[in-house]
């Protein structure tokens, strides 16, 4: 799937501004938003963030999902690879669709 085929609108410029301001070097989508079972009325958007080396977001991390929700218009479940369960981490990383990558 490509970003153009997603069932939600992604403003890549707003996403880029969000990521640059927070030291995120890669932001990807995973989960139901990439599959046919995504329900725009009920589903949240699963996001996987990779921070640049040395970036430590601290407690601000917990507000990033709400900030992204305002950009994408859906509730966001904000994650890093370390926060994902070891039982499905590898699968998530394999299926993730990047929507921002630091140049």
Can you describe what each PLM-predicted range is?
Residues 46-49:
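Short, aliphatic-rich beta-strand segments
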């Amino acid at each position: 799937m490509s970003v153009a085929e997603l069932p939600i609108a992604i403003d890549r410029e707003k996403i880029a501004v969000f990521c640059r301001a927070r030291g995120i070097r890669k932001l990807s989508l995973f989960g139901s938003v990439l599959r046919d079972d995504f329900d725009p009325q009920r589903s949240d958007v699963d996001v996987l963030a990779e921070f640049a080396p040395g970036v430590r977001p601290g407690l601000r991390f917990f507000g990033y999902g709400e900030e992204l929700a305002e950009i994408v218009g859906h509730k966001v479940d904000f994650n890093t690879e370390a926060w994902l369960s070891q039982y499905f981490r590898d699968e998530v990383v394999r299926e993730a669709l990047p929507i921002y990558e630091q140049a």
